[in-house]
């Protein structure tokens, strides 16, 4: 036996129709998933008519809250191949950054060290190029 609950997308028009015609019985509250307050309305005649009037103003937020709670608006796309972006006639592959290989910083020679103060040089990383001679066996 399956216990899946299939929640409907609540409609504001339907909720107002239920409020107008059956609001004193709390049917509109049951419709938007407010079971406890629906029972209270059922037993008290819409809390003696006051809750019936207040719900004319609260109903849009009740419907919105119900829909946000029971319906996820996220779409997930699972693709076994890389996604290719298309703009007109040009195709773009997703950006894939190239790895950088760290190199030892250049140290001054011993004689330079004593003759002048050491000036640190900026390290400028170079992109990995697999066909470069320095990476060939």
Curated annotation (Swiss-Prot):
Listed transmembrane segments: 12-32, 39-59
Recorded superkingdom: Eukaryota
Annotated InterPro entries: TM2, TM2D1-3-like
A Pfam family hit: TM2
Gene Ontology cellular-component terms listed: membrane
Residues covered by the TM2 domain: 9-57
Topology in membrane: Multi-pass membrane protein
Region (Disordered) location: 106-137
Keywords per UniProt: Membrane, Transmembrane, Transmembrane helix
The keyword Glycoprotein appears for this protein: no
Record-stated family: Belongs to the TM2 family.
Protein name: TM2 domain-containing protein DDB_G0287015
Source organism of this protein record: Dictyostelium discoideum
């Amino acid at each position: 036996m399956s216990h899946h609950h299939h929640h409907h997308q609540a409609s504001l028009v339907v909720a107002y129709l239920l409020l107008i015609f059956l609001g004193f019985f709390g049917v509109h509250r049951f419709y938007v998933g407010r079971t406890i307050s629906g029972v209270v309305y059922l037993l008290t005649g819409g809390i003696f008519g006051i809750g019936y009037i207040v719900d004319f103003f609260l109903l849009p937020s009740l419907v919105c809250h119900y829909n946000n709670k029971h319906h996820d608006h996220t779409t997930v796309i699972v693709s076994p191949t890389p996604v290719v972006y298309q703009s007109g006639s040009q195709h773009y592959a997703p950006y894939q950054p190239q790895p950088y290989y760290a190199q030892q910083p250049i140290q001054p020679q011993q004689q330079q060290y004593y003759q002048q103060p050491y000036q640190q040089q900026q390290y400028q990383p170079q992109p990995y190029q697999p066909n470069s001679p320095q990476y060939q066996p």
